[in-house]
Amino acid sequence: MLRSFPLFIGLRYSLAQKNSLLLSFVSLISVLGVTLGVLILIVALAVINGSIETLRKEALKSTPHVTIAGPGLQANWRELRDLALRSEGVIAAAPFIEAEASITHQGEAAFIAVRGIDTALESSVSEPGSATFVDLLASLGESETGVILGAGLAGQLGVRSSTQVSLLSLGKLLRRRLDEGQGAEVIGFADFGLYSNHNTALMSLTAAERLFANDPGVDIRLRLRVSDINRAGDIAAQVFSDYSELEITPWNEVQASL
């Protein structure tokens, strides 16, 4: 009885007699208004969910699923990587260093994040990329001074493949050690996602260690790729439960808005 009462009221006012045309009209308009409002809400939620998913994919092109940092990692990152690879939920793990630097080309300059990577392992922890990106990583591993720039950054600086650029770590720049910059050859460009295309460059781990030599706070970290990004933090916490000194940062803390 209670379930049919609202239906009874709706039909009563929508199907009123001819002497109640105004009431029927108002009721009909109200029903149509509610229906249209619900439809707009459904469409808006679908668009928002789709946009968030797109932004998440763009962010994960450059943001690690999980970043592991902390004292002692410099010395035993290989053992910790092996531990991660033996653990359930971890697909791949690779070392990297990352710090800020200035890049200069023909009077154009920008401050960027330079990431030093293990070129043999990077493709395993990155979001699935094109065959071109895999080839670029192979070329980067063969070059002592090579660098891969974000496509947006390359356009901003007006550089092409095989162009020479100058790099200087932010630490050395602040200490006015301008003579310790190093040259690098642009071997190609990559899509690092919406958030990083204009401010990211990749170098080999060895070249990046030379660039940031003697800069404080630039230490090796581990990057993990996990099977379930929604549980990234929990998976890493289980893997390194015996290492309380390590700092575990999942992607959704770095990109909290997503």
Task: Please describe what each predicted stretch is.
Residues L39-A113, S123, V134-S143:
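Hydrophobic, regular-secondary-structure patches
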Residues I97, D135-T206:
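Hydrophobic secondary-structure segments that place a key small or acidic residue at a functional site
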Residues S62-P64, G89, E108-A113, T145, ...:
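Envelope-exposed proteins and targeting segments
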Residues L15, G33, I48, I52, ...:
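Alpha-helical membrane-interface segments at transmembrane helix boundaries
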Residues E79-L85, P128, I235-Y243:
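Short amphipathic alpha-helices in soluble, non-transmembrane regions
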Residues A120-G129:
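Cytochrome P450 core scaffold surrounding the K-helix E-X-X-R motif
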Residues L174, L178-L258:
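Mechanotransmission and gating elements of multispan inner-membrane complexes involved in transport
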Residues M1-L39:
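N-terminal Sec/SRP start-transfer signal
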